[in-house]
Amino acid sequence: MTLEEIKMMIREIPDFPKKGIKFKDITPVLKDAKAFNYSIEMLAKALEGRKFDLIAAPEARGFLFGAPLAYRLGVGFVPVRKPGKLPAETLSYEYELEYGTDSLEIHKDAVLEGQRVVIVDDLLATGGTIYASAKLVESLGGIVDSIIFLTELTFLDGRKKLDGYDIISLIKF
C-alpha cells in the first residue's frame, strides 16, 4: 500500500453537499481495512519524534482518524464538537463560514495548562474548523504542537488561515 494508492481511492462526488462543490469522499479508504490501517500508520509515522500529550479532533470526520491515531500512539483523545453535544461545562469558539458563522466547543477540563496537543482532521480545505479547534486548545492553556491531515485541497489555501502552526498533510489535491 502507498499514499498514492490511498489518494486514488478517495473519490470525487460532484455537487455535494451543494452545487459547485467537488466533495472528496474518504469512505472507500475507511471501508478498506488495509487502506485505513495504512493511513493511520502513515499519520503516526509523520508524528515520529514529536513529544505531545493529547490528540484533539473536530467532529465528525476528524474523529475517524483522531481517535485511532491517539490509540496507536498511546495518548489521550479530545473531541471538539458542535454546540450542545458535550455533557460537561464547555468553552466555545465562533468562526466564519462562506455563508455565515458556526461554532465549536471543547470541555473546559479537556486540556491542561502546558499540555502539548496535535490536532487531527481528515482534510484541510479553508482551515476554518481547524483554526477554531486550535484556538479552543490555546484558550485552555494548551500548546498546539502540530496540525495533521490525511488530505489537503491546496487550491483553497487553508494553510494561510493556519499561518504560524506546523502543518502536515500526507496527500495533496
From Swiss-Prot:
The record's subcellular location field reads:
Cytoplasm
What is the protein name given in its UniProt record? Adenine phosphoribosyltransferase
Which HAMAP family does this UniProt record tie to the protein?
Aden_phosphoribosyltr
Its keywords, alphabetically, are:
Cytoplasm, Glycosyltransferase, Purine salvage, Transferase
EC number(s) stated in the UniProt entry for this protein: 2.4.2.7
Q: Give the enzyme's main class according to its UniProt record, as a single word.
A: transferase
| Matching NCBIfam families | apt, PRK02304.1-2, PRK02304.1-3, PRK02304.1-5
**Cross-referenced InterPro entries, in alphabetical order?**
Ade_phspho_trans, PRibTrfase_dom, PRTase-like, UPRTase/APRTase
- Report quaternary structure and partners: Homodimer.
What's the encoding gene here? Answer: apt
| Role this protein plays | Catalyzes a salvage reaction resulting in the formation of AMP, that is energically less costly than de novo synthesis.
